């Protein structure tokens, strides 16, 4: 779904964004129309479901999940990686890849599916397979922009007792070992349940909040800045050009280009409009553009890279490797084989 705040003229947008140290218009405008809050009472809705659902998301918060059993134990702490292997901010990582003419490999997995011990191993495995950035989903009781594969993954994670606290505890142990940055992807309610300082302390480098209500954009953007976290925003084929410009100005780390209107999940083919969408975004920003939704085959990532994307995001197809396995051990083997195949398909 596309968010629907009042639009502004392109000239006023351009002039408002001249001051480099000021929050982008998308964020700054809301500070004059909403009472600032330290917690995040709303945000930028840039999903691809219906307009009615977008309106509902701006004023409602998903119900809390039912009481769940205690999460699986986190693996024992291991020695931190050497200093030269410590992860860098997302923007630095993407800039280094662009300078080399490389396309970023950005896999997504759900924390806690099937348990957090397996998630910790999956993070290490993906890092070893050459992931440039890892998106880690924090389960939410109403993952409404996601398709059946990720919804089922989220349900398994919640059933295993996965909570934000448990995810952050696991990340404190694992992120010192990783050479690539981790970006948390979750919905509004889980993100607002903890301070951003806790997330940064756990080794998180960025955030993606797909149902971020529009009126909380300024407060979240500002607090993310204060905690050296990069807030990645999404744009979709349904977003008008003036709104897309606002999003690209505000997004940090990279611009997340959703390839299709609809929910997550593998597609047989890449939307042919993605080529022109990439160029439209690149006309208004020099920030990296990463494409996600529906990508599941080596030929998909090759095509998207040829069209000029700076990164390729693979979610449901990654989640399926763990979710459809007979055991965590088998799932990790499947994940490694699949991840290496997708990584090797990129230039």
Swiss-Prot record:
It catalyses: (1S,2R)-1-C-(indol-3-yl)glycerol 3-phosphate = indole + D-glyceraldehyde 3-phosphate; (1S,2R)-1-C-(indol-3-yl)glycerol 3-phosphate + L-serine = D-glyceraldehyde 3-phosphate + L-tryptophan + H2O. Residues 1-53 form a transit peptide. Residues 1-38, 64-89 are annotated as: Disordered. Its main location: plastid. GO terms for molecular function: indole-3-glycerol-phosphate lyase activity; tryptophan synthase activity. SUPFAM superfamilies: Ribulose-phoshate binding barrel. It comes from the Eukaryota. Residues 8-27 have a biased composition (Low complexity). Keywords: Amino-acid biosynthesis, Aromatic amino acid biosynthesis, Chloroplast, Lyase, Plastid, Transit peptide, Tryptophan biosynthesis. Its EC number is 4.1.2.8, 4.2.1.20. Pfam families: Trp_syntA. One of its GO terms (biological process) is L-tryptophan biosynthetic process. Residues 64-76 have a biased composition (Pro residues). GO terms for cellular component: chloroplast; cytosol. Coiled coil: none annotated. Pathway: Secondary metabolite biosynthesis; 2,4-dihydroxy-1,4-benzoxazin-3-one biosynthesis; 2,4-dihydroxy-1,4-benzoxazin-3-one from indoleglycerol phosphate: step 1/5; Amino-acid biosynthesis; L-tryptophan biosynthesis; L-tryptophan from chorismate: step 5/5. Tetramer of two alpha and two beta chains for the tryptophan synthase activity. Homodimer of alpha chains for the indole-3-glycerol phosphate lyase activity. Mutant rescue experiments indicate the existence of a second tryptophan synthase alpha gene whose product might be involved in tryptophan biosynthesis while BX1 might be restricted to free indol production. Belongs to the TrpA family. The alpha subunit is responsible for the aldol cleavage of indoleglycerol phosphate to indole and glyceraldehyde 3-phosphate. In bacteria, tryptophan synthase alpha (TSA) activity is almost completely dependent on formation of an active alpha2beta2 complex with tryptophan synthase beta (TSB), and indole is usually not released during tryptophan synthesis. In maize, the TSA homolog BX1 catalyzes the formation of free indole from indole-3-glycerol phosphate, independently of TSB. This is Indole-3-glycerol phosphate lyase, chloroplastic. It comes from Zea mays (Maize).
